[in-house]
Amino acid sequence: MEAELIRLGLLNTDEVKKQSQDQPLYKKYFPHGTSHYLGLDVHDYGDKYRKFEPGMVLTCEPGIYIRDEAIGVRIENDILVTEGRPVDLTANIPREAEEIEELMNK
């Protein structure tokens, strides 16, 4: 996360080297976690150290929020744990701005 924010020019290497470990600088642009369980509730709670079992669904949701420009985006994938490879339940959902705009104009 930090490397990408540096690449985008939102953070610089010197700032990152001097940052507090208790309050990492990336939190300004990414204030939430990267995942949660999905089940009976949208944000199901579970032990984060629990072993994944077939049938569980969890999210992978990176995001970026640039308050100074009043923009933000978070893309969520919902992942089903199976006996074999995990299945991305949201694999066929539009992700690119053009795809979303096209869908909205139908």
Regions found by a protein language model. Name each.
Residues 34-106:
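Charged, cofactor-coupling segments
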